[in-house]
Amino acid sequence: EQVCCGMPALLSGDEQSADKLGRINQEIFKTETVITVCPTCNRMLAEEYELKGVRVMDAFEFLNEVSNFQLLTSNIQTRTAYHQPCHSAGTKAPEIIKAFLKASTDYQEIDDVCCGGGGLFTFKYPELSDMIGQRRMETLLLPETSNMKPVTFYVVTNCPGCMMQLEYLLSSGKQGIRVRHILNLITDAHKTGCPVPHTQE
């Protein structure tokens, strides 16, 4: 069975554990393509592993390549904004996700700002993490909702770590804002057979 990619160990300076985990995974990932749902794992596999001849792809990027969005839900009638994970910088995933959200939802552009998560950074430097996170929260005060009852909208991302941090930051306020992984947003719409609701609270 595959194990942790080893990035937490590597960033903690435990190269020995990271190498051990990497060797286990490299024995398993003898295939053409490895799909990830986490940008940090993606970066670790793509840059630190020796996966010769193996493509490492974000799951949404893979879906776009094999279906060109044809299998994905269109017309998801809700407001969205995209939070770009820091480890997605330099990859194709952010632009692909933004293009889909712009075509399928009432998309609101927001600045690319770190959420302050950073994996173990949150636990080692909680005060600094919160300070960085508040900068992210400030960008979610959209002008359209600042002087009215807030419309529910989704902050969409492709990183589970960013999701946890954003949910934590939103837990003390900003009602009407929800956090969803891009794959969950699509899955929700498919399960219900109708668009994700666009509601007011």
Residue ranges and their predicted role:
Residues 1-201:
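Iron-sulfur cluster-binding electron-transfer modules in prokaryotic oxidoreductases
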